[in-house]
């Protein structure tokens, strides 16, 4: 199960505007915050992690990502109705541009989510937009306009440092931070239980994962797994959930997705619009799931059934039985996902 659930979160009113230069002066690297880890604290060589120091340093770099999604229910008689549900996850502040604060999270935390809000450590919130995502790696980058962040909030924000995770050892102590159950950030501890693990979620197989016994719950998706120096070594995203199973949570190592994150950070921010203003592609298509793909030897993607005459798809040269596997350098696996991108 994904660690990001459709759980009620709590949002507060948006922050007021702030001068960009003020944000630049106030936002600092986690490893350099005054209240956190100092040069005199040799945590890396300590036999016991200073969890309080790590949490103090990292919490200002963590955000809640809350929004809404449309859920379709079904009944015994075949009739169903749609209703709006709340969704909660976690994000990690990893950088900023001249105009935006940049946040890394899981793709499933922000995919098909409306009214996306970012809640900072001081409780203030701001509208959040998606810059891009890589669904087959479950990684996304979102952005908040610096003009939507007050100077007070900016002074409490930190930027997390992404650490090379290739030298992580089994048994190494770690700290996990995330918006568990949509109730705000919480801190848990554990160790690296295993490396290079694979799991399948919603017919997509993820490989090269870290397994940890640190408690990871719904809402923790997109949160940080930190080493003793307060640096992000992995991004929490899933856990094994069944009777008799405990302590099997999974995180995506930073080293596996650093290039993807860097690429997504440079993309143009996408502001979601109403369906009547969305771009029209002009195709009817069906999803090729991983099961169908493996059986027929097709790639996972969208199989075009028809192309409307004189549509954008027609003008671009798309034809019946073509398979769409990507859009704007992003992986496409479902028609609904493509529609959401448009």
Indicate residue ranges for each PLM-predicted region.
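Terminal peptide-recognition signature
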Residues: 60-65, 91, 101, 105, ...
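Short, conserved beta-turn/loop elements at beta-strand boundaries and strand-helix junctions
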Residues: 68-71, 96-98, 112, 133-137, ...
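N-terminal activation segment of mature serine protease catalytic domains
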Residues: 2-79, 85-90, 114-115, 169, ...
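Active-site loop architecture of trypsin-fold serine endopeptidases
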Residues: 72-73, 80, 84-85, 113-116, ...
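A conserved glycine-rich beta-strand in the N-terminal activation segment of trypsin-fold
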Residues: 44-53, 72-102, 124-129, 159-161, ...
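Extracytoplasmic/secreted envelope proteins and their assembly/folding machinery
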Residues: 51-62, 88-90, 139, 168, ...
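Conserved active-site neighborhood of the chymotrypsin/trypsin-like protease fold
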Residues: 95-185, 332-333
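C-terminal recognition in membrane/secretory proteostasis and scaffolding
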Residues: 1-25, 107, 129-130, 227-233, ...
């Amino acid at each position: 199960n994904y660690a990001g659930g459709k759980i009620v979160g709590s949002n507060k009113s948006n922050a007021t505007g702030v001068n960009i230069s003020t944000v630049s002066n106030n936002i600092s690297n986690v490893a350099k915050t005054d209240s956190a880890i100092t040069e005199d604290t040799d945590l890396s060589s300590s036999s016991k992690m200073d969890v309080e120091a790590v949490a103090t340093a990292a919490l200002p770099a963590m955000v809640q990502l809350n929004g809404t999604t449309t859920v379709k229910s079904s009944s015994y008689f075949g009739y169903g109705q749609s209703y709006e549900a709340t969704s909660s996850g976690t994000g990690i502040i990893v950088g900023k541009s001249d105009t935006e604060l940049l946040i890394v999270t899981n793709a499933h935390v922000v995919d098909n989510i409306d009214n996306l809000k970012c809640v900072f450590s001081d409780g203030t919130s701001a509208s959040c937009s998606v810059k891009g995502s890589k669904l087959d790696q479950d990684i996304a980058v979102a952005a908040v306009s610096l003009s939507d962040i007050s100077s007070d909030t900016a002074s409490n924000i930190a930027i997390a440092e992404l650490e090379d995770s290739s030298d992580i050892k089994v048994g190494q102590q770690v700290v996990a931070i995330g918006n568990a159950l949509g109730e705000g950030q919480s801190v848990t501890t554990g160790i690296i239980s295993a490396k290079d693990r694979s799991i399948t979620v919603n017919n997509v197989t993820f490989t090269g994962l870290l397994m940890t016994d640190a408690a990871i719950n719904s809402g923790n998706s997109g949160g940080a797994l930190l080493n003793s120096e307060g640096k992000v070594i992995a991004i929490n995203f899933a856990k094994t959930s069944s009777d008799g199973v405990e302590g099997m949570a999974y995180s995506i190592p930073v080293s596996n997705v650093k290039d993807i994150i860097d690429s997504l950070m440079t993309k143009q921010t996408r502001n979601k619009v109403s369906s009547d203003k969305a771009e029209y592609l002009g195709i009817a298509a069906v999803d090729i799931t991983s099961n169908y793909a493996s059986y027929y030897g097709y790639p996972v993607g969208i199989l075009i059934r028809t192309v409307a005459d004189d549509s954008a798809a027609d003008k671009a040269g798309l034809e019946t039985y073509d398979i769409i596997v990507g859009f704007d350098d992003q992986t496409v696996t479902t028609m609904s996902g493509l529609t959401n991108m448009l």
